[in-house]
Amino acid sequence: YTTTADLNIMDTYSSAYAYSYVSNGKISSSFINVGSWWTDRYGTDFGTYSLQTIHHEIGHAIGLGHQGNYNGSASYSSDAMYINDSWQASMMSYFSQSENYNVIASYAFLMTPSAVDWIALDDIYSDYSGYGVSNAFTGDTIYGFNTNISASQSNIWYSFSDYISSAAY
């Protein structure tokens, strides 16, 4: 038991950011701020930019970086480092699906990490946790609507379709 948290989430400041303390090459604790100004402006429900921002900042807190060399603001035409840089591929991207003219996708906010995020997290943590893709569901797994994942296997994956009305692709 400890009196300090590994992950501290607050709304003290008006901006959205994450900061991590690193010790011996590992994150020892992180602070995430998504200010009340942010949630007042973008809402707090599922499918809002606020929820996507919280996911993005948690991504930083657990070791993920942006998809390019940008921070604070960016333009796809001048800052994207690869052709698929958009929310469609990663919650860590700064670019909506409609900002990236190279992808065919509808504008939508993300409800979960995207494909690139899962791959990066697997790369960072699978050797330490045993939760990597090599230990994930095998076979013809259906995620979301009409999932074949039972609640006993993963209540989180089982419940995703209850919270989303539109996909981010």
Identify the role of each PLM range:
Residues 1-169:
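RTX-like calcium-binding, glycine/aspartate-rich low-complexity repeat tracts
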